[in-house]
Amino acid sequence: MNPSQHAEQFQSQLANYVPQFTPEFWPVWLIIAGVLLVGMWLVLGLHALLRARGVKKSATDHGEKIYLYSKAVRLWHWSNALLFVLLLASGLINHFAMVGATAVKSLVAVHEVCGFLLLACWLGFVLINAVGDNGHHYRIRRQGWLERAAKQTRFYLFGIMQGEEHPFPATTQSKFNPLQQVAYVGVMYGLLPLLLLTGLLCLYPQAVGDVFPGVRYWLLQTHFALAFISLFFIFGHLYLCTTGRTPHETFKSMVDGYHRH
């Protein structure tokens, strides 16, 4: 049996391992996660409103540009983003039983292909960081980290409303602030590998099902929970990208590779 058949078989037997989430059935943990996600949107919306009413920064182009994002990094970034969207969409649609059996088969195939492509992207990311100059941005300097993180937190909560300058501007030595660095390291070297691993085990259930018969339930629950956690990161990441001198400035840097001060 090929991997696609394994995936389709596993998906068709999903209800045997974990109930599909329908409007009539939402487990308590999913309700809590949903409330937290909505709460996050409200907090980000309030923060955006306070920023808009605060001191305005000049949007004038100061001509200070630093080339921080190579073509390889930008290609990886946009490929990663597209695959994440496709995987989340196909996975959530299946879990919430939004379509019929015929569409499920197509969504499983999309999910499988995108999963392998995401694995390739992640391996490329690890390779770029291992042999290129991008890796040092992910090495956390532990000495004084708490003080730096506190300073960055204060900026996000108060300083940004007052038009203060960023305490840790992006440079060729460090393109991430302390909070960004920890978040990106956690996602790229923790959350994403776990998502890929649980996804592969879901694709090849016979690898664990015969040895640990009850593990399939927890495998699916874990994979779905990790995917839901990634939603928090994605929304937070997108919002923070709007906190530059202009709302579109950071997005532009991922197009041409230049960070603007």
Curated annotation (Swiss-Prot):
Topology of this chain in the membrane: Multi-pass membrane protein
Keywords: Cell inner membrane, Cell membrane, Iron, Membrane, Metal-binding, Transmembrane, Transmembrane helix
Annotated gene: ydhU
Compartmental location: Cell inner membrane
Binding site for heme b 2: 111, 223
Paired cysteines (S-S): none
Main location: membrane
Pfam families recorded: Ni_hydr_CYTB
Domain of life the protein comes from: Bacteria
Residues that, per the record, bind heme b 1: 77, 237
UniProt-listed NCBIfam families: PRK15006.1 (NF011582)
Organism of origin: Escherichia coli (strain K12)
Classification via SUPFAM superfamilies: Transmembrane di-heme cytochromes (SSF81342)
Protein name: Putative cytochrome YdhU
Inducing stimuli: Up-regulated by the oxygen-responsive transcription factor FNR under anaerobic conditions. Repressed in the presence of nitrate or nitrite via the two-component systems NarXL and NarPQ, respectively.
UniProt key word Oxidoreductase: no
GO MF term (any one): metal ion binding
Positions with a binding annotation for a menaquinone: 237
Single biological process term from Gene Ontology: respiratory electron transport chain
Cellular component terms (Gene Ontology): plasma membrane
